[in-house]
Regions:
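N-terminal BTB/POZ boundary and linker segment
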Residues: 2-59, 90, 94-112, 225-232, ...
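Alpha-helical oligomerization interface recognition
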Residues: 43-79, 128-132
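Short interface patches used for recognition in eukaryotic signaling and trafficking proteins
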Residues: 50-52, 76-83, 97-101, 114-116, ...
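Interdomain boundary/hinge elements
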Residues: 73-84, 144-148, 242-243
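Long amphipathic alpha-helical assembly cores
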Residues: 80-85, 180-211
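Short, low-complexity cationic-aromatic patches
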Residues: 86-91, 167, 171
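Post-BTB helical module
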Residues: 101-194
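Long, highly charged low-complexity segments enriched in Glu/Asp and Lys/Arg with interspersed Ser/Thr
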Residues: 202-226
């Protein structure tokens, strides 16, 4: 109990003084991420930045094949402590909260930026799927201009470029295909200088530009934003994006 209070106060102080930035939480209770010792359930410790997080071996091993391997030393499930080097304590806490059955994390764009790379690294399929579903839903809201989700053209294009990058880096096929479809109508100048496009490997860059060129040739129209419905029908005949 004392350890939990100390961790909470320390985090609140750091956040208030600008020493620490973390994704937005819904309320103060969600900021408690110290995973204190529980004599009935704790049987493994994860050490990050010389801080100890007390967790359940079974939960970690069921969620992640990577954790399963780390906790099995020479095929024997006897590892009592594992260290995650070069990881952010705050980011690991948020990630672990996403896979803990006793926690609920309401995802948003900021938290996904943190959680998605870790979920991919540790191969946590359930969390990867949740992140992809959230991003696809957000795309649907943005395209439909749902209140609270509207974005300016440039902001919208950058979000689609981010989704294309995430789909590429984290093997999210549905997200990749949808983001590519949405970027095709826009001119290269809209996104070529964004950090997300610059981080893309050559293959998706080529696919994006080639798909746009094919669409332009089929419709005989150079657009920036969207092709007309008639042009879309002509351009989509027999056309399928490969991942």
């Amino acid at each position: 109990m004392q350890r939990t209070k100390f961790c909470t106060l320390t985090r609140l102080f750091n956040m208030a003084t600008g020493l620490e930035t973390v994704p937005k939480m819904e309320n103060e209770s969600e900021m408690i991420g110290c995973f204190p010792y529980d004599e009935e359930t704790t049987d493994v410790v994860i050490r990050v930045d010389n801080k100890r997080l007390h967790l359940s071996r079974g939960t970690l091993m069921q969620a992640s094949p990577v954790f399963r391997k780390m906790l099995s030393s020479n095929g024997k499930e006897n590892q009592a402590e594992i260290t995650l080097p070069e990881k952010s304590y705050e980011e690991v806490i948020l990630f672990l909260r996403c896979i803990s059955p006793r926690e609920f994390v309401k995802l948003d764009e900021e938290s996904i930026d943190v959680v998605l790379p870790l979920a991919h690294e540790y191969k946590v399929k359930a969390t990867l799927q949740k992140c992809e579903d959230w991003l696809l839903t957000e795309i649907k809201f943005i395209v439909g201009e749902v209140t609270g989700h509207t974005k300016g053209t440039q902001e919208k294009v950058e979000f689609f470029a981010k989704c294309l990058l995430y789909g590429t880096k984290h093997d999210l096929e549905t997200l990749y295909v949808r983001a590519l479809e949405l970027l095709v109508p826009y001119k290269l100048s809209r996104y070529q200088h964004t950090k997300f496009y610059k981080l893309l490997p050559d293959k998706p860059k080529s696919q994006l530009l080639e798909t746009r060129m094919v669409k332009i040739e089929k419709t005989n129209s150079i657009v920036d934003g969207h092709f007309s419905e008639e042009e879309e029908e002509i351009g989509e005949e027999g056309e399928e994006i490969e991942y």
